């Protein structure tokens, strides 16, 4: 996936009301694994689904492809720390195979890249925990807006006299929006924009956090 997609998904979830939860690897954009055999799975439900697919007439390859996309084990593979053996996770034998992309997708590489998914997550967390905005993100109301926009997820976080608009364009086309008043400040953009106005055009997979 593109890094803009991953940053947008993080924006839309971490700024909702409730306790933010980051599952291992989410913050660097770890992906599903390219499974080679049903024997590589640890999840019993996945193995059961594989055998049911064979009984239904699927070939071994098709059955493996289908269960591989949906298996819970995709979210359980070892954390990809660096490019060393076993992605720096262990000197032993990991319980699940490593994702083949760990030489490219790992913490060490993203720490050095200012525009990485990992460093964007750090900005998100810093914004949510900042002295200026932590109360609104922790205790503020969450009000859905722009409901007529099918491919747009948008909500306002509101508390006392503060309002923050969170926008995410899930579509493959630009989304044009008009605000009722000039916004005060663009707090965060997954595409590194620094300014925003009353008329907003969001690119595909663009997110924006706007102080109203």
Identify the function of each model-found stretch.
Residues 3, 197-212:
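C-terminal beta-strand-rich structural cap/linker in extracellular carbohydrate-active enzymes
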Residues 174-192:
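Beta-strand-rich binding/interaction modules
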Residues 158-160, 191, 212:
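Short, flexible beta-strand-to-coil junctions
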Residues 162-163, 194-196:
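Short, surface-exposed beta-strand/loop "edge" segments at domain boundaries and coil↔beta transitions
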Residues 169-170, 212:
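Residues immediately flanking
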Residues 86-87, 192-195, 207:
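A short acidic, often aromatic-flanked loop/helix-cap motif at beta-alpha or helix-coil junctions
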Residues 1-164, 170-175:
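Loop/helix patches that line or flank the sugar-binding groove of alpha-linked glycan CAZymes
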